[in-house]
């Protein structure tokens, strides 16, 4: 899928936003990634979505979808970093859409289909400064890795010396399926619902649906305890691995005030959380990940 013409026309231009220099378009190159989708309870998922205009995308009955995706961004405007996304597939509108239909390519624009990002730890401080301060993503710096082994690809997310989340995906036998798509990310920041779009392409491999091809482990850190209430399926609906991707993050952002029936009583996180951040590309120490001991395992490094 081609990026919009406006983005293609930006090629070769430059921007300076929040003191971060960007060579446009905002792109990534040669970046491997993994993805795994698990079914979850739609009612419990709805409790994690802020506001009343974003709704869990139901796959069937009262089952929605938890999306775990991790990217080893090897070449970007702001250096190399790992990004660990925890999100819920969603629709955007006054009411929830029917089951499954919003996931169909021709219906996605009608239903505002995308993913609501619950948590987005990253390796570097500058990634937090840009991703959160500009696009409103819930980024924060954490202990992350991305490990490619002969039979598996995995990532572990630690914080404050505790395990938060670990995901491991079996490597498919065939990893050369061409794939290109565009998706939307929804996030809550500064009392607003923020929407950003990303286009990416690459070659991928996918495992058979509903097999034990991916393993998700939720730790005991308080930050991720809400995930334990989602009734996450033991087997993924699908899982896959991208040996390399090329991506473009749209510099256009949509935002709406988050409104409620009653006046909000708590102040949402705002610009004070990013105002003092610098542009360091240094990573925190890697987590204590058992995958690092596998023969032939290769871990991402700064």
Region spans (language model):
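Interaction-surface and assembly-scaffold signal
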Residues: 2-20, 119-302
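N-terminal ordered "arm"
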Residues: 18-69
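Catalytic micro-motifs at enzyme active sites that drive phosphoryl/nucleotidyl and oxygen chemistry
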Residues: 23, 72-78, 141-143
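Solvent-exposed loop and beta-edge segments used for protein-protein assembly and interaction
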Residues: 28-30, 62, 78-82, 149
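Hydrophobic residues positioned within well-ordered beta-strands of beta-sheet architectures
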Residues: 34-36, 84-86, 155
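Generic structural motif
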Residues: 40-43, 73-76, 91-95, 125, ...
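Glycine-rich loops and low-complexity Gly/Arg-rich segments
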Residues: 60-63, 91-96, 111-115, 144-145, ...
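Hydrophobic/aromatic-rich structural module bridging two neighboring secondary-structure elements via a short loop
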Residues: 68-119
């Amino acid at each position: 899928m081609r990026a919009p013409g406006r983005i293609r026309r930006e090629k070769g231009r430059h921007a300076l936003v929040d003191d971060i220099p960007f060579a446009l378009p905002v792109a990534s190159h040669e970046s491997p990634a993994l993805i795994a989708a698990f079914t979850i309870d739609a009612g419990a998922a709805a409790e994690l979505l802020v506001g009343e205009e974003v709704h869990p995308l139901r796959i069937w009955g009262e089952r929605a979808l938890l999306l775990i995706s991790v990217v080893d961004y090897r070449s970007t405007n702001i250096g190399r970093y790992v990004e660990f996304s925890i999100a819920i597939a969603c629709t955007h509108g006054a009411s929830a859409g029917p089951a499954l239909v919003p996931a169909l390519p021709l219906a996605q624009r009608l239903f505002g289909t995308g993913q609501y990002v619950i948590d987005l730890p990253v390796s570097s401080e500058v990634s937090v400064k840009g991703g959160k301060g500009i696009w409103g993503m819930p980024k924060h710096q954490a202990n992350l890795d991305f490990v490619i082994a002969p039979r598996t690809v995995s990532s572990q997310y630690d914080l404050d010396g505790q395990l938060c989340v670990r995901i491991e995906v079996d490597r498919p036998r065939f990893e050369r399926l061409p794939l290109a798509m565009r998706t939307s990310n929804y996030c809550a920041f500064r009392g607003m619902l923020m929407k950003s779009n990303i286009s990416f392409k690459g070659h991928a491999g996918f495992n058979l649906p509903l097999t034990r091809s991916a393993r998700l482990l939720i730790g005991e850190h308080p930050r991720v305890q809400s995930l334990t209430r989602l009734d996450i399926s033991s087997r993924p609906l699908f899982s896959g691995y991208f040996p390399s991707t090329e991506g473009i993050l749209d510099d256009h952002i949509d935002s709406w005030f988050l409104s409620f029936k009653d006046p909000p009583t708590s102040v949402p996180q705002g610009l004070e959380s990013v105002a003092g951040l610098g542009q360091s590309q240094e990573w925190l120490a890697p987590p204590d990940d058992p995958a690092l001991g596998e023969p032939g395992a290769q871990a991402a490094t700064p």
